[in-house]
Amino acid sequence: MSRTRIYELDVFRAICTITVLLGHVSSYPVGVLSTDSRFYGLYLGVNSFCRFAIQAFLFLSAAVLVHSYADRWQGPESALAMWRKRLIDPGIPYVVWSVIYTLLAIRRGRHIDFPTFLRLLATGKAWDHLYFIVLIFQFYLLFPLLLRALRSLSCRPVLWLGIGALIQAGFHMWDQRVFAIPNRASWAVRFGFYLFAGMLAGLDFDVLQDWTRRNRWAIAAVWAVSAVLNCSVSAAIRLGTPHRLSGYAELIVNVYAVASCLFFLAVSQWVTALNGWPMRAAMGISNASFGIYLSHPLGLAMWRRLTATGNPILFHLSVWAGAVVVLALSWAATLWLKRFKFGWTLVGK
């Protein structure tokens, strides 16, 4: 496969970035509002809607990595070059932001000594969103072995996807029925299916593109049904109300996440085909996505402090205005920092 840029994946990355932001925007009112609030259901629905973002980001990262390296992989030399680029370049911003968020947590009254900080750094727990970076680092470390396995099974895609699903299901069953795994969100195997599916897609993305075009209406239908089920079950669990499907919550959220990956890939194809301002905006967000991802929780924390109010109307306005303002500022700050020699230590290269 030629190493051409796949613009649909840039649009997809922008969608994932905005979804992560919306998830963090909506989680705050879900946590502070009374369940009797008129708008509580709206915030809870938006938050539940965003539950596919990390899975989609992992799928995307795996697809991009295979697309970038599969045809030019030369064994150990390629592995070392890939690790230098993919571990060090994002690793330094990760450490810097872990320090920043640790200082923010200390300022809010949390006691964190140096050994605790090292544990937070290793597990991505310095702030709620940083565990994703740890997941990606694990995938990068295992990538040479996984790529070799993928090449052996590329002609048997169903088996490859089945192995990914079994790894993920096995992790879940072990955690639920054998031994509660510490920091379960920080283990890449928890999302094994999405990584395996992304790697398979990266081998020949045109195949997936053609399939989603042919089946776009079926994908949309499955996505809509799974979205409703995900939101209703998530709401029932959050509110502690009975729901006949509560026992299948893990399965439902995974069906929803898979359907969302396919649905928003189809949306990305449509946006790319239009080739208008939505695509240009998506490309801009995609190019700044790492900086936006790392910095936006700090922006949201500052915004909430500046706009704190007891007025219900102003509170709701500030929630949604904060999403727009923080996206714009983190995007602009990323572009600005990239102009400087050492700006990459904050926003990546």
Q: What are these regions, as identified by a protein language model?
A:
Residues 22-25, 163-176, 223-236, 298:
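Aromatic-anchored segments of alpha-helical transmembrane domains
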Residues 7-70, 90-98:
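Functionally critical transmembrane alpha-helices in membrane proteins and complexes, commonly lining
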Residues 54-67, 137-147, 170-211, 253-273, ...:
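Specific transmembrane alpha-helix
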Residues 269-283, 299-349:
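C-terminal "closing" transmembrane helix and its immediate cytosolic amphipathic cap
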Residues 101-177, 182, 188-195:
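Hydrophobic alpha-helical segments with transmembrane-like composition
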Residues 208-288:
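Alpha-helical transmembrane segments and terminal signal-anchor/GPI-anchor hydrophobic tails
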Residues 47-55, 68-104, 115-128, 284-293:
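Transmembrane alpha-helical segments and their boundary/interface "anchor" motifs
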Residues 44-55, 121-135, 175-195, 231-261:
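Interfacial loop-to-helix transition and helix-capping segments at the boundaries
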